[in-house]
Amino acid sequence: MVDSLRACVFDAYGTLLDVHSAVMRNADEVGASAEALSMLWRQRQLEYSWTRTLMHQYADFWQLTDEALTFALRTYHLEDRKGLKDRLMSAYKELSAYPDAAETLEKLKSAGYIVAILSNGNDEMLQAALKASKLDRVLDSCLSADDLKIYKPDPRIYQFACDRLGVNPNEVCFVSSNAWDLGGAGKFGFNTVRINRQGNPPEYEFAPLKHQVNSLSELWPLLAKNVTKAA
C-alpha cells in the first residue's frame, strides 16, 4: 500500500453492513426461498440504481430498496403475506454489521486515518443502520450519494468524497466488497481494496485493484505500515 494515505473510505452496504441480515432475521416466515429472495432483492436494488442513473430518473436508495423488495416478494409469491414487506424494510434499517467491522474502524481511526463512509444510501437509512450497529460512534464522516442525486460508480461521487474530506484521490484507501464500486473508484484514482468474502473471481480489470483480502480484519495489517504517515 502507498505511503501517502490519509483517509480510509468504506462502502456501507455489503462491506460494513450485512445486506442479507434483514431477510435472515425473518427466515422462518419467508421460508425455503429466504436466501434466494435476499439475493434477488439485492440484485434488483443495485440494478435499479444503475438503470435510473442511465435514464436520468433519480429516486433515493430507500425507494429503490422498496421497489426491489416488491419485485422479489412477487417473484417468490410472498407479496400477499401480511406485514412481511414492512417487517423486512424495518429490518433493513437495522442491518447487522459484520463482526469485524467496528474493531477495524477503531484501529484505523486510532492510527490517525480519516475514517468515512461513501454510500449510495440516503442519509436517513444510513444513519438508522449505523446507529443500530453502533458504527456511527467510530466514523469521522458519512457521505451519501443522495447529496448529488446520482449513484456510484459515477466519478462525481468519488470526487465528492475528496472534496468533503479535503484529500486527493491518491491519499484515499477505498474499501468495498462490490467489484463494480471498486472499478469506479480505481478508475477515478483511489487505492482500492476488495473485501472478497465469497472468493469471487476478478472483475473490471480495466480499473486497477490494488489489494484483495477475505475480511475486514485483514485490512488493518495491510495498512498498519502506514500509520506514521497518517498520524
Swiss-Prot record:
It comes from Burkholderia cepacia. Gene3D superfamilies: HAD superfamily/HAD-like, Putative phosphatase, domain 2. This is (S)-2-haloacid dehalogenase 4A. GO terms for molecular function: (S)-2-haloacid dehalogenase activity. Residues 176-181 are annotated as: Important for catalytic activity. Belongs to the HAD-like hydrolase superfamily. S-2-haloalkanoic acid dehalogenase family. An (S)-2-haloacid binds at residues 12-13, 42, 119-120. The record marks 15, 152, 158 as: Important for catalytic activity. Keywords: Hydrolase. The keyword Hydrolase applies. It comes from the Bacteria. (S)-2-haloacid dehalogenases may be used for the biodegradation of halogenated substances and their derivatives which are widely used as pesticides, herbicides and other industrial products. The keyword GTP-binding does not apply. It catalyses: an (S)-2-haloacid + H2O = a (2R)-2-hydroxycarboxylate + a halide anion + H(+); (S)-2-chloropropanoate + H2O = (R)-lactate + chloride + H(+). Catalyzes the hydrolytic dehalogenation of small (S)-2-haloalkanoic acids to yield the corresponding (R)-2-hydroxyalkanoic acids. Active with 2-halogenated carboxylic acids and converts only the S-isomer (or L-isomer) of 2-chloropropionic acid with inversion of configuration to produce R-lactate (or D-isomer).
